């Protein structure tokens, strides 16, 4: 299942919930009828990252459920985010050229950290690997906003793990000043923003980012955290008879879905 964007393109690769109890979150997703991947622990070229995840793989994109497991700087950043709320704190863009994105972000003042070689072993010992571009939290305060390149995508999108008929379609950003925040995200993403009613959309080759005020997002989603934050995401469905609806997720996960 080809998830890698074409040269010169970007996609909405995944979003992530930061949660205190990985297994409780996974159980709640399984009760909702989803296939959840087994747990695996992250590591970088410097050693254990201190977090583990389980994932919902879709036909396009995926949702990561991530929990801190150790006392590392990375795990502490996750815990700090969860002090505000349990829910969606990460938005990742897929790229075929992470080094080029790193250079572009540096040129635009985002001060990216050195390229990270992220990996984790699946339950059967098979490694999955990524190149990841992070920026300091102050540069993108809405969450952990990053780029990644998949190096072993066939191992992640295994036939038995894919939740068929679903695609990751949009991520929602809460902004005190939607125009200003959308302009910054547009520079980060290298795309042109466009106004859509109460929102500003940032379209990608696959998926999009939607920026709006808290009031506008509450009208759309039913709830939204204070700015700056990520409010939730949208899944598009190819399932027959699926009507567009907003789903409030269990407290173990936090956040909301727009699905349909």
Q: What is each of the regions a protein language model found here?
A:
Residues 43-48:
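Acidic-and-aromatic substrate-binding clefts and catalytic sites of carbohydrate-active enzymes
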Residues 1-12, 17-37, 49-51, 58-117, ...:
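Glyoxalase I/VOC metalloenzyme domain signal
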Residues 39-41:
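A short acidic/basic microdomain associated with nuclease active sites
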């Amino acid at each position: 299942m080809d998830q890698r964007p074409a040269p010169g393109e970007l996609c909405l690769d995944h979003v992530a919930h930061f949660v205190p109890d990985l297994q409780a979150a996974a159980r709640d997703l399984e009760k909702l009828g989803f296939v959840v991947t087994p747990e695996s622990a992250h590591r970088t070229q410097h050693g254990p990252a201190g977090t583990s995840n389980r994932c919902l793989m879709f036909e396009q994109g995926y949702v990561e459920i991530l929990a801190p497991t150790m006392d590392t700087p990375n795990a502490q950043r996750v815990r700090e985010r969860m002090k505000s709320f349990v829910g969606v704190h990460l938005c990742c863009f897929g790229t075929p050229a992470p080094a080029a994105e790193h250079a572009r972000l540096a040129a635009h003042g985002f001060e990216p950290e050195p390229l990270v070689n992220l990996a984790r072993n699946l339950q059967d010992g098979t490694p999955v690997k990524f190149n990841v571009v992070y920026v300091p939290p102050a540069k993108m305060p809405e969450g952990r906003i990053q780029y990644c390149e998949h190096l072993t995508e066939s191992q992640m999108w295994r036939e038995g793990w894919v939740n068929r008929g679903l695609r990751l379609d949009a991520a929602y950003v809460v902004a005190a000043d939607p125009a200003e925040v959308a302009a910054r995200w547009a520079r980060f993403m290298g795309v042109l923003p466009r106004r859509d009613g109460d929102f500003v959309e940032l379209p990608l080759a696959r998926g999009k980012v939607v920026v709006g005020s808290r009031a506008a997002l509450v009208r759309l989603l039913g709830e939204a955290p204070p700015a700056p934050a990520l409010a939730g995401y949208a899944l598009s469905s190819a399932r027959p008879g699926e009507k567009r609806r907003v789903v409030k997720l269990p407290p173990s996960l936090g956040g909301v879905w727009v699905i349909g």
